[in-house]
A protein has these predicted regions:
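Switch- and interface-adjacent substructures of P-loop NTPase systems
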Residues: 2-123, 160
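Generic structural signal for well-ordered, non-membrane alpha-helical segments
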Residues: 2-5, 111, 139, 201, ...
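Canonical P-loop GTPase G-domain recognition
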Residues: 113-126, 131-197
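Charge-patterned, long linear interaction tracts outside catalytic cores
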Residues: 198-213
């Protein structure tokens, strides 16, 4: 079952969706990765609709509790569990307020909560700034401001109009957020045999160090 999405203020997602059920192998530039997306509500924002009904808080079933719980609580619990237990990297999708009826200010608190939580648990992530006009100077300025504030890549993009190439760029940018833990270098045997102080070997080592730091 695919996640649902629509224009307007009404929340469409009711529970996390894993797409596809089994990870798909995707080639990105010079390396491949097994990818499975987990779509979740995130934190409910002011002026959104769908988390209450005529009887008060909307009650929903979740995989984590036997009984129904309020939608807002379910959204928060689900989001936290997805971030902590079911993901290795995060893509935070927020907006400049141009995509619908909600303003930029409505998203900021929830956006900060997600970013703070990802930083606290050390999950690598990037931010997508969804906009109907991602190329305009004011959108790029907002992305730059957010990038400076959050210290992570912030990519302005129109999610509705993005291409396959855009998706590859997003995945590539996200994967580059993983820290480099080890670099293996294959040198010709005759260079490996030289002493560590040999001038030629030192040139090789210095160039390798420059390229990875």
């Amino acid at each position: 079952e695919l996640p649902q999405s629509a224009a307007g203020r009404t929340i469409m997602t009711t529970e996390p969706k894993f797409v596809p059920s089994n990870a798909a192998k995707i080639q990105i530039d010079d390396f491949s990765a097994n990818v499975r997306l987990v779509d979740c509500v995130g934190y409910v924002i002011p002026n959104a609709k769908g988390y209450e009904d005529e009887n008060g808080p909307r009650m929903v079933k979740t995989p984590w509790y036997d009984e129904e719980i309020p939608f807002i609580e379910a959204a928060e619990v689900g989001t936290e569990k997805v971030i902590k237990d079911h993901s290795t990297i995060g893509i935070v999708v927020t907006t400049d307020g141009s995509i619908g009826e909600l303003n930029r200010v409505d998203y900021v608190e929830a956006e900060n909560r997600v970013v703070t939580e990802l930083k606290e648990i050390g999950k690598p992530f990037i931010v997508l700034l969804n906009s109907t006009h991602p190329m305009l100077p004011e959108t790029e300025r907002l992305a730059e401001k957010m990038q400076e504030e959050y210290d992570v890549p912030v990519l302005p993009i129109s999610v509705e109009n993005m291409t396959e190439r855009d998706i590859y760029n997003i995945l590539g940018e996200a994967l580059y957020e993983f820290p480099v833990l080890e670099v293996n270098v294959d040198m010709p045997e005759w260079i490996a045999c030289l002493s560590a102080n040999h001038w030629l070997k030192k040139i090789y080592v210095d160039k390798i160090r420059e390229s990875v730091i």
